[in-house]
Structure formats: C-alpha cells, structure tokens
Amino acid sequence: MFVPISQIENLAQFKKEIFNGKIYVFEKSKITSHLVDQIKKKIGIDYSGELEKLHHFSNCEEMSTYLVANLKNTEIFKNLFYEFLNSINFLQGESYWDKFVVRVAPAINKFKYREASRIGVHRDTWGTNIHQQINWWAPISSIEETNTMVFFPDYFDRPVKNSSGSWDLNIYLENRKKGDFSYPSAPELLEKLPDNVRILPVTIKPGEILCFSGSHLHSSSKHKSENTRFSYEIRTVCQDDLDSKNEAPNIDCKLKWQFPKIFRNMKDNSPMKITS
C-alpha cells in the first residue's frame, strides 16, 4: 500500500489516487536529506545526545516539550520543504500549508503535551472539515514498528464514531493560548476498533517522505518501545482542488464548520479562505 515514488508525472492522477486512499513514499533526495540534517543541527543546539535515547534522561518530557516549541515553523525547514514540493512537481497554482511541526513521540506513551506525545486514532480532516487536505510525514531519526505511525486502511471509506460533531477548534486554540491543554487537541475516536483490525505500520527511513490523504484513519503505535521517535509533519491544500471540489470522501466528519484559518498561502502567508 505504500507506493514508492521519486517525482509526480501527472499531478491530476496523483491527487486522484491520494484522495482515493493511496499512500505514497517519496524517495530520499539531496533536498530531503538536507532538511533532516538541518533539523538535527537545530536540535543539537539544545540536545547533543542520541535522538532515539532521549527518554533515558530524567527531564525528557520537559526537553521534548521545549524542542517541539523551539523547532516549530522554522523558516529554513519550510523553505527546504517548499523546495522539495517544487522538485517533485507538486506546486501548480496557489497552494497553502499549515505549520511545520517536529514531533517527539516518547518510548513510553505517558507524556501529556500533544506534540511531545503519541497520538490516538483519528482522521486529520475531523479537525478541519477540509477534505482536500494532503498530509506529509517523515522520520528524523530511525523508527521501528513499536514507535511509529500506523494506518487502519480498511477504514478509509468506513465510518467510525467520533467527537467531531461537538468539537471546536476555536475553543482549543483559545485554551492553548492560556496554557490550558485540558480541551482535546482534535476530535477523538468514540468506539473501540476490533482486536483483529488490519494495521499498517510505517517503517520508512530518514530522508523519505510519506504522503497521504488527511482522511485516512491513523494513529501512533501503542507499544512500549526502546526508542524515542523524532518526526516532522506538515499539511497542504491546493486552490485548484478547492475550486473543483477535488477531494477525499467525507465518511464521518460532523464538524459544523470548516477551519481554513490554520492554512497559509505558501508565497505571501495570507490566510486561506473558502467560499461557497
């Protein structure tokens, strides 16, 4: 299901396949390797140890939280990612992205801060109600099946009970400004998936980049691990897809509104707007 690719030959066909559930893995390149190196370089200013062994330090939770905040939306990271998107022929017309986030997933799943923790089962589109959203995810350090991202591919077009109908991004953002993380950072799964559910763990290498629809049901793996995971992620939306309603199916998102304001124009940083 993870299809290797180096460059997009036909963007329309590529997006059609993404919005129908296909998951691509872009191969390692000079640009993506340089991006990983730059992230590691900035991490090294504050933490010079082995990334996978951060959890051995007594202050690992505080350090993880600090690193995530300090690395978020770093200009050189976004510039290099833009260069990557251009190199694979993804950029045609106006395009938008959210913040470039470096995430730390602890070896033991006990941290409270969302971007320095493991994430529960969700679709990213539950939080935006924008089904043209494409996700990009990549490891910075080596990963293993006990601490990675996992997909539930049989649920791409199968609904599950979730809290999107009562969740509000504005409430979360307001609480976050006050340092209050008690409100869920995203809508949550409200049912237990079967014990025999098919799970696809991601085992790509640093320098490779995963690309998939934000409508995929996915989560962090739940196992206790010997390694802390460092990864980065960003989401994109293209104006052409908004205009043409080229999108993944909305299976179970019940948000009352759409939340385009988290996306910004890649060129001039203006907020994305959606008109009926």
Give the label of every model feature segment.
Residues 146, 150-211:
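Double-stranded beta-helix
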Residues 124, 198-200, 218-221:
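Generic recognition of flexible, low-complexity loop/linker segments
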Residues 216-276:
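Non-heme Fe(II)/2-oxoglutarate
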Residues 48-53, 156-176, 252-271:
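Short, cationic low-complexity segments
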Residues 1-91, 205, 272-276:
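N-terminal auxiliary "cap/dimerization" subdomain that precedes the catalytic jelly-roll/cupin core
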Residues 31-32, 107-109, 126, 141-144, ...:
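Short, solvent-exposed loop/turn segments at secondary-structure junctions
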Residues 134, 208, 230:
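Residue-level detector of short, conserved catalytic/binding motifs and their immediate flanks
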Residues 86-150:
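Conserved double-stranded beta-helix
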